[in-house]
Amino acid sequence: MNPLTHAERQALGRHARKQLARSAHADFKRDICPADPLALLAESMRGRVARLVPVKYQRMASSPFGFFRGAVPIMAADLACHPNTGLMTQLCGDAHVENLGAYAALDNRIVFDLNDFDETIRGPFEWDIKRLATSLILAGREAGIRKVDREEAVATFIRRYRRSMRRFSNMPVLELARYQIHRLAHIGPMPAIFGQAERSTPLRLLEKLTEPVDGSAAKPVAKKIAAKKVAAKRAVGSSAREAEHIGAQPRRFRSLPPLLERVTGADARKVLAALDQYAKTLQPERQHFLAQYTPVDVAFKVVGTGSVGLRDFVVYLEGHARPAHSDPLFLQIKEEPASAYARYLPDGAAAWTHQGHRVMDGQRAMQLTSDPFLGYTTIDNRDYLVRQLNDHKAGLNLGTLVAANLHGYADLCGELLARGHARAGDSVSISAYLGSGPRFDEATLGFAHAYANKTEADWDALRRWLKRNPKAAAS
């Protein structure tokens, strides 16, 4: 229960301006952040699978935005050595333009929201804003979008965040808890994202990741069905057609090293045994659904950029439909170290005894609708998050990004991030701090430019280091 009145919460937000003026958010002083970025990066690699560390370096060296995606430990240190507002909420922790995406809700709707919470933790609300704003600059540069359009996208994002937070601060609690954004289908790149999500069925993932047990080539899936037809028939018709084309033979994971490798023997038994503990973290009715699936095979998978080198297993399960593989479920069992922000926050490192539990709770707090199979488990004293690998998931394609789409997408990012922060924090205090004018917006735009430039310098330093140490990127 919140013991403060609405007026007291507003006063708390206004008082925070004395601790950190809104105009001060423009400051990024590299000289007061003594940590060596590459040393922080190397430290974050400790405990990871050594043979995969070069893969992470390769992905980070591909572009400044690729570097940014894998450099949360660096940005966490840089944010922490500057003053903050002290207005805490649940952070996404890795808020950037590719960490929002579409996925299937339990009621079969395709929804769109923040969707990566490996770094989630309670922290100053502005840290998420600064990271996402910087990502808009870097993504815009990578897509070849003009500076004026990049700046307008960042301004649009922050303005929408501020105005949405003001709206949420005056909204009844249950209305906020249920708040949905209904204009999604008409925003910038969203039609393409939703079309991709409709096509990204479990059966298509089955064909991509598995093969018949005898090793013969799988029959190709029929031509892609138009998005509208898939939307109308996804529950019955399209699934039946896809299953028919895949065939009736038993299946197992393909071997595509180092990105996908089958796990067998004692190692596979450890992973499967961990599903029992995981099941206890699900709600009772979802435990019932899970119990109707039978594990078939286990693999080790490399995903993303920031997570490369962490232990990441995939379990292929089959349901009761016939043939059994026409009812696949893929569970990702993903190692979760402590959040990169934890060391810089009061009690951050001690707040959670299980890092998978931390991620699950942070995700549920910020999302309107979460993966119905979201849970956690432990393998060999390491903490893991469990979720569906891909159930109608889709996201932004930087290769097709244009200025008009970036503006609309930035606007959506602002509203979704504000909703997540309002659900898990004090919207009244945050809104009172931000105020009704553009002072915070303009300052944060300045920060985003400065930090994007700093990221490019760090990226260049990584590339030069890899040239001097070619074995570090030799996978």
Describe the residue ranges of each PLM region.
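Conserved ATP-binding subdomain of kinase catalytic cores across diverse folds
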Residues: 4-92, 97-201, 225-231, 278-475
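Acidic catalytic cores of enzymes that act on phosphate-bearing nucleotides/polynucleotides
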Residues: 197-224, 228, 232-307, 316
